[in-house]
Every structure is written in C-alpha cells, then in structure tokens.
A protein has these predicted regions:
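Alpha-helical solenoid repeat architecture
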Residues: 1, 22-38, 79-96, 129-144, ...
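Elongated alpha-helical scaffolds that mediate protein-protein interactions in large eukaryotic proteins
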Residues: 1-23, 30-53, 64, 70, ...
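Amphipathic alpha-helical segments within extended alpha-helical solenoids and repeat-rich scaffolds
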Residues: 2-15, 45-67, 100-121, 152-173, ...
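Residues within HEAT/ARM-like alpha-solenoid scaffolds
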Residues: 3-7, 15-26, 40-43, 47-51, ...
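Amphipathic alpha-helical interaction motifs in eukaryotic regulatory proteins
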Residues: 10, 25, 29, 53, ...
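Extended amphipathic secondary-structure runs
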Residues: 83, 87-104, 180, 232-244, ...
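Eukaryotic scaffolding regions of large macromolecular assemblies
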Residues: 140-319
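Intrinsically disordered, low-complexity regulatory regions
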Residues: 256, 261-392
Length: 392
C-alpha cells in the first residue's frame, strides 16, 4: 500500500480466484490497522466494497444452486470467505461512513448463514463467527436491507438462525470464551430487534423472554434459552456478555423499567436498573400492582388487563405463586420470639456502634477528653442495659 499499489490490489479482488481473494484480502485487512490508509479512497475510487460484495456473492452461489449431491467444500473456499468477511468487518468498523457500501453483501451473507450447518460443539468457529461479525455494522434501516433481513415469506428465518447460534454458543463455550465469541451475536440481536417489524419483535420477545413454563420454577433455573440468558446476566466472570444480555432483555421490555421487572423478576432487574441510573419501582409489588398512585392508575389497570400473569407471580423471583413450594414451620413460642428479638437487637447494636463513633468523632475533637468519655459511657450503658446472656 505504501508503494502505491492499492488500486492494483483492489482490482485483483475482481478475479474469480479463491487464491487471489485470500491473499489480497489478508494483505488489505492487515493494512486497515494503519491509520494512514485512506479507506474512503479505497472504497470510493478503487471499488473495494463492490469487489468484496462480489466475492461474497460467489461464495453464496454454491448454497442456492440446485445440486443433486452436495459437494464437499474446498478448504480454500472457506479460507477465502473468512478473509473477505474479516476485511469487511474492519472496513465498516474503522470507516462507518461507508458501511452502506457493503449493503449488497447482506442477502448473500444471510444465505450462507442460514444454509451452513451449525456445529453444536463449536457453533461460532469460522466462518459462522465472521459471518455474524460482518453483519453488525451494516445499516438495517434501508428498505432493501429490511426486505432482505425480514423476507415476507419467512420474516423470522434469520432471527431464528441467530437464536439457534446464541443457544448453542452459551452451551458450548467456557466463560473465558463467551465475551469474545457470543457478545457479537447478542449485539446483532439488539440491532435486529431495534429495526425489526412489530411481528418479528413479538416473536423475539416470545423466544428470548421467560415464558409461563419457565415460571414454574424460580426464574433462571429452567433449561430454556431465556433461563440460560438470565443466569448469564448475573455471571461475574463474563462482564461483557452479562451487560449485553441485560441490555437486550431491557430492550425486549420496550426499555420500560416496570415491564422489565415483570419480565425478568425484581431480583434480576434491580441491579441493572440501579447501575444505569434508571428509576426502579419503589416496591417490587408495584411492577405487578393494579392500584398504584393516582397518576399511574390507568396504566396499571391497562397492564393488568393485557398481562395474563398479573397477580399470579412472585414479583421478586418471577415464579408462579401456585408453583411455589410451601415450607411448613411450627409457629414460634413467645419465649422464642423474645430471644430472637434480643439477638437481632444485639446484632443491630454491633452494626450501629461503629457508626456512632465515626459520626461523633468530628465533634469530640472540639469537646476534648470529657466529651469522648461521656459518649463512651453512653454507649457502654446501652450495652449493659440488655439482658444477661444476650451477647451469646
């Protein structure tokens, strides 16, 4: 590139040769990390995006051509495809202003993604992972791209494929691999949901949010995709996946804190809402209530009519009340209640006393040793006023 051969390199990609595609794509891919490369010039003047889309379309032909027998793929075919996809991702990432130039590749990528078999042991190994990555930066808001991603004959076909990849991915990979491999799938699903027609959005909500069957147990304990996502939303060893899953579930809840609590339970929702400085329902029951404050009565009543689970769900755990296990315990005697009250009082005192010392420390320095002695006497007298044996 520094020698001025960028035009020749881009023209070389026109050749219907997997060897040329592999080598030239790899070379240009490596140069994208050099900030001195004029990517807009490569795309606008030397037709780099057009040539990449052409090569990807060539790879897609083998999946749409009717063949009596499926030929075994040439290893060079996949290697060249992977390099083209990696180059495409880097160009759309480092030069987002020209991401739209790669839109012609969208239908071909989707064909390959839906026709290729997905491994259960390594579902995001190349070329599946690079196919997903290549889709992330392509704008979906144009009419042609929406028609390609959500075809009228089967609007959910590509979403279902991504859901399948996601489910196999979170089952197959260890925690230390999830952030790198699975996060792009979640990011793409968020983008797809944002641009999808309403019927596709409803389908995604049905698949990715907990169902009534999931609520037969405490949310997150079933083996469905939705329950697995909930478990990973609190996994401390996968910070990127954890954050992306929570954000996706919040998006699926129409970015409404109340619906979010209804969908995933107060336990899973509270931490995410707090971290993002979003208003949290003051009471877990508020998310399911039908008689909130005067200003939200109409909304709560509407939610109650629209939600068949209203009044049937534990708002903290998300489990159906009728499926909760009842723990039968003998009622405490009066003496047991008093002993328990004393124990709690002692624990409370142990917690409060250090706070008293720290709070009054700033004033003691002005009152001198007499002030410190007086406060020490007050605290000690409170301790000894409790019953004998209460410190055990």
């Amino acid at each position: 590139m520094d020698l001025g051969y960028e035009q020749k390199a881009c023209n070389k990609l026109k050749n219907d040769s997997r060897d040329d595609e592999f080598l030239v794509s790899r070379i240009i891919f490596l140069t994208t990390y050099d900030s001195s490369i004029d990517m807009e010039k490569l795309i606008d003047q030397y037709h780099l995006a057009e040539n990449i889309c052409l090569n990807i379309s060539r790879h897609a032909k083998q999946f749409v051509t009717k063949q009596k027998k499926v030929k075994e793929l040439d290893p060079m075919e996949d290697m060249a495809l992977i390099e083209s996809l990696k180059l495409m991702f880097n160009l759309t990432h480092f030069c987002p202003e020209r991401a739209g130039a790669f839109s012609p590749a969208l239908p071909h990528i989707l064909v390959i993604l839906t026709k290729r078999a997905i491994s259960s042991s390594k579902p995001l190994d190349p070329p599946i992972g690079p196919l997903v990555n290549a889709l992330i930066n392509i704008p979906l808001d144009s009419k042609d791209n929406l028609a390609a991603f959500f075809p009228k004959a089967a609007p959910n076909i590509n979403v279902d494929r991504l859901d399948e990849i996601l489910e196999k991915g979170i089952k197959a990979y260890a925690d230390n691999e999830l952030d790198q491999l699975v996060s792009p799938v979640l990011t793409l699903l968020r983008k797809v949901y944002e641009n999808a027609p309403r019927e596709v959005q409803q389908h995604m909500q049905t698949v990715l949010l907990p169902s009534e069957a999931d609520r037969e147990k405490v949310l997150g304990r079933a083996e469905s995709l939705a329950s697995r996502l909930l478990r990973f939303s609190t996994n401390p060893s996968t910070p990127q996946v954890r954050e992306t899953i929570s954000t996706l579930l919040f998006d699926l809840s129409d970015k409404d804190a109340r619906k979010f609590v209804q969908n995933v339970g107060y336990g899973f929702a509270a931490g995410f809402l707090f971290q993002h400085n979003m208003p949290i329902p003051e009471n877990a029951l508020e998310a399911w209530s039908t008689s909130d404050s005067e200003g939200s009565n109409a909304r709560a009543s509407q939610d109650s009519r629209n939600n068949p689970l209203s009044g049937r769900v534990n708002p903290i755990t998300g489990q159906l009340l009728e499926k909760e296990e009842l723990i039968e315990e003998e009622e405490m005697t009066q003496e047991e209640k008093e002993r328990e009250a004393e124990r709690l009082f002692v624990l409370f005192e142990r917690f409060v006393i250090p706070i008293k010392w720290s709070c009054y420390g700033c004033s003691w320095q002005y009152k001198g040793w007499r002030g410190r002695a007086w406060w020490a006497w007050r605290i000690q007298s409170r301790r000894h006023s409790s019953r004998a044996g209460s410190w055990n």
